[in-house]
Amino acid sequence: MKRLIVVFGAVGCAIALACFSERGSGPVAGPAECRVPVSVIDSLHFIVAIRNFAFHPDSIAVPAGATVTWVNCEDVGQEPHTTTSDSAGVWGSADLTSGDRFSHTFATPGKFPYHCIPHQTFMRAKLVVQ
């Protein structure tokens, strides 16, 4: 009887640990942009990775006519992010979940600070179109 109680107790503890432990899903396996630290595809296509609640790189200069693509490289299940110009109407993405991407082509030179709406107090970056 004692042995049976010990076995059931051990099984119960194992089940409880499995149910309540926090397990990450690991890195995003999908987009190649998340696996390789690439920010320039060619002279008119640039990648900004969203990882660890930050934009990488956090400052980028591109020529007029370039397309910038933001890719959410956070683990599956993390909070969504946006990429939104500080100046209203320049650009703004919908919520980007893990693996999602948003692209915008910049025709006009200028300085464009931007942020993530849900995390705008700390998740900020700058884009310069030359």
What are the residue ranges of the model-derived segments?
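Sec-dependent bacterial lipoprotein signal peptides
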Residues: 1-18
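Extracytoplasmic copper-binding redox domains, predominantly the cupredoxin/blue-copper superfamily
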Residues: 19-130
